[in-house]
Amino acid sequence: MQAYQRDFIRFAIERGVLRFGEFTLKSGRTSPYFFNAGLFDSGLALARLGRFYAEAVIDSGIDFDVLFGPAYKGIPLAATTAVALAEQHQRDLPWCFNRKEAKDHGEGGTLVGAPLSGRVLIIDDVITAGTAIREVMQIIDAQGARAAGVLIALNRQERGKGELSAIQEVERDFGMPVVSIVSLEQVLEYLVEDAELKKHLPAVEAYRAQYGI
């Protein structure tokens, strides 16, 4: 685990974004942990989050021309990542996002920001079922651009209905990498090292044994 990954997990726990206990997921599974990126909900938290995304962008080595934030949750994530890449890594890159509804006045269309062209890095919080990413791929294709990869905050590393995770299905179907700031593997490492949170380790390990990939 890299230093920025450890710092991100600590930050997510401090903000209440990553919590341990008993949670019912949309899938119906009872999970021993829950991740809600919507709780990075202050200016300072968003600025810091962008720096973690930027670190993961650099770490991934993915070659791309433009950042894309899918509506709605991906919009502030792409914006703060673009700011952090420029300020922390001297990489001033274009970014854009889509609207869910097309406008018939002003700039029109469903895309806002820089042109969606060349190699596109998609920025989002998590991939649950992969439905949102499939919609994004249609937007990218329609612009004649191509997806270079996807960056998310957390990879839960768990199976969907079949043997693969939604992330593995996206990688297989579109031939592109999906990378994350951290995965469940790093969360487990963090729990091992943290005296106070170690008590949650057996439940998380049992969950991974049942649903992990």
Swiss-Prot record:
It comes from the Bacteria. GO terms for biological process: 'de novo' pyrimidine nucleobase biosynthetic process; 'de novo' UMP biosynthetic process; pyrimidine ribonucleoside biosynthetic process. PROSITE patterns: PUR_PYR_PR_TRANSFER. Pathway: Pyrimidine metabolism; UMP biosynthesis via de novo pathway; UMP from orotate: step 1/2. Orotate binds at F34, F35, T128, R156. Its EC number is 2.4.2.10. Its cofactor is Mg(2+). The keyword Transport does not apply. 5-phospho-alpha-D-ribose 1-diphosphate binds at residues 26, 72-73, 99-100, 103, 105, 124-132. Keywords: Glycosyltransferase, Magnesium, Pyrimidine biosynthesis, Transferase. Pfam families: Pribosyltran. This is Orotate phosphoribosyltransferase. It comes from Pseudomonas aeruginosa (strain LESB58).
